[in-house]
Amino acid sequence: MAGLKDVVTREYTINMHKRLHGVSFKKRAPKAVKEIKKFAKLHMGTEDVRLAPELNQEIWKRGVKGVAFRLRLRISRKRNEEENAKNPLFSYVEPVFVASAKGLQTTVVEEDA
């Protein structure tokens, strides 16, 4: 459990194509948002997952049915500074703009504090 207590930032490549296979056209972008939240919850172990507005723009930029096959994401586990917060940690997901997301591995990003 000690591993979940620390603040960390990692970059992931998430294959949206396999997560959205078989989803009807008008539900693809909303399903992509839900799948990204589910992915962040699984990999960071936090209930509270927040998406950056830029990520929402990236998902929706080609319309409701044109979600990119792969997305490169930077997921940060941060401390919740609010007073009576339900969860002590939350995950913040933002996009990483790369030419191609193919073949990239998961990396730990060193934060500049």
Swiss-Prot record:
CDD domains: Ribosomal_L31e. GO terms for biological process: cytoplasmic translation. The keyword Transferase does not apply. It holds the Pfam family Ribosomal_L31e. Disulfide bonds: none annotated. It comes from the Eukaryota. InterPro entries: Ribosomal_eL31, Ribosomal_eL31_CS, Ribosomal_eL31_dom_sf. It comes from Candida glabrata (strain ATCC 2001 / BCRC 20586 / JCM 3761 / NBRC 0622 / NRRL Y-65 / CBS 138) (Yeast). This is Large ribosomal subunit protein eL31. GO terms for cellular component: cytosolic large ribosomal subunit; fungal biofilm matrix; preribosome. Keywords: Ribonucleoprotein, Ribosomal protein. PROSITE patterns: RIBOSOMAL_L31E. Belongs to the eukaryotic ribosomal protein eL31 family. GO terms for molecular function: structural constituent of ribosome. The gene is RPL31. SUPFAM superfamilies: Ribosomal protein L31e.
